[in-house]
């Protein structure tokens, strides 16, 4: 399986990952947690935590979200009950969408 190079991500994506990593580091230090404490609590390696805090885009999103939650960062600006309600709303919308998207066929006008 080919690995995606960081250079293929948009600038805003790279900035968002960097910002989230810095916010995680600030929250961790604010709670007086070492990288070892947080990585143990999240069930990840110290190296992975360090990559998350640097904004590495190759980190698993589940690990990033878990670390952010442990240090108290609020994800999606919602509490758990409203997040569950928003998931239900998204499921309802997805149910109304077509299961498959077929590209529209271009009709070539070759009548000169």
Predicted region positions:
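Generic structural marker for isolated residues within well-ordered, non-membrane alpha-helices
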Residues: 24, 35, 64
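A short, Lys/Arg-rich alpha-helix, primarily the initiator
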Residues: 2-29
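Short alpha-helical DNA-recognition segment
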Residues: 32-48
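Short, charged recognition helix plus adjacent turn
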Residues: 78-112
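DNA major-groove recognition helix of helix-turn-helix/homeodomain DNA-binding modules
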Residues: 60-78
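Residue-level signal for the short linker/turn that defines the boundary of a DNA-recognition helix
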Residues: 22, 32-33, 59
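Short polybasic/polar patches that bind polyanions
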Residues: 29, 40, 69
């Amino acid at each position: 399986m080919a690995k995606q190079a960081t250079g293929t991500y948009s600038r805003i994506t790279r900035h968002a990952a960097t910002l989230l990593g810095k916010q995680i580091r600030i929250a961790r230090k604010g709670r007086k947690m070492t990288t070892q404490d947080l990585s143990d609590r999240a069930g990840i390696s110290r190296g992975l935590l360090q990559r998350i805090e640097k904004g590495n885009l190759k980190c698993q999103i589940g690990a990033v979200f878990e670390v952010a939650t442990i240090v108290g960062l609020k994800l999606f600006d919602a509490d758990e009950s409203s997040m569950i309600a928003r998931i239900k709303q998204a499921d309802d919308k997805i149910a109304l969408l077509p299961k498959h998207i077929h590209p529209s066929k271009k009709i070539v006008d070759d009548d000169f």
